[in-house]
């Protein structure tokens, strides 16, 4: 997919400028080959994938990597590239405010299909761009009394693995 190609271009650009490149898993709990069938092949069906995903999470837990206090360590002046050079453009789009309250997560199953009920968390865009913690949402969903929200997050990881293993 596009993002893999983009990351390779950025890595090359940084290397050419003698800047180290670090790649971190941050938008999923399990990536690439961490949830595969016993024969090492990727899943093509959601249900067995989700069962293995849940079993692994229950066994290993959800790691916590708090980063809120690290933002000031980022460089504010960067002459290597700008956001436009890596494909970003300015937008006037206003995003919906997300809601990850216990009320939303606990009532997700009964309200998610009714637009008038305001029953979704509206975190899709934030998850996509990594501005909200996937691990925190997974942990919160797991601790709730409703597994539907957790299964939606697992579906997101399943879909990303499908895109990785079967890019056509």
Language model regions located:
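Trp/Phe/Arg-rich N-terminal binding region typifying the photolyase-homology
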Residues: 1-57, 145
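Glycine/tryptophan-enriched, flexible segments
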Residues: 48-167
């Amino acid at each position: 997919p596009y993002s893999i190609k983009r990351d390779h271009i950025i890595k090359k650009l940084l290397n050419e400028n003698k800047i180290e490149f670090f790649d971190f898993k941050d938008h999923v709990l399990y990536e690439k080959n961490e949830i595969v069938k016993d024969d090492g092949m990727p899943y093509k069906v959601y249900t067995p994938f989700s069962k293995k995903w849940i079993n692994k999470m229950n066994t290993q837990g959800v790691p916590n990597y708090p980063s809120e206090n690290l933002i000031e360590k980022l460089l504010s002046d960067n002459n290597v590239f700008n956001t436009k050079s890596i494909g970003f453009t300015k937008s006037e789009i206003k995003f919906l405010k997300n809601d990850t309250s216990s009320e939303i997560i606990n009532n997700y199953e009964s309200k998610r299909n009714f637009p008038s009920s305001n029953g979704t968390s509206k975190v899709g865009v934030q998850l996509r761009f990594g501005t909200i913690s996937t691990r925190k949402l997974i942990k919160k969903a797991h601790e709730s009394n409703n597994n539907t929200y957790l299964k939606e997050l697992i579906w997101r990881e399943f879909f990303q693995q499908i895109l990785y293993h079967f890019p056509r």
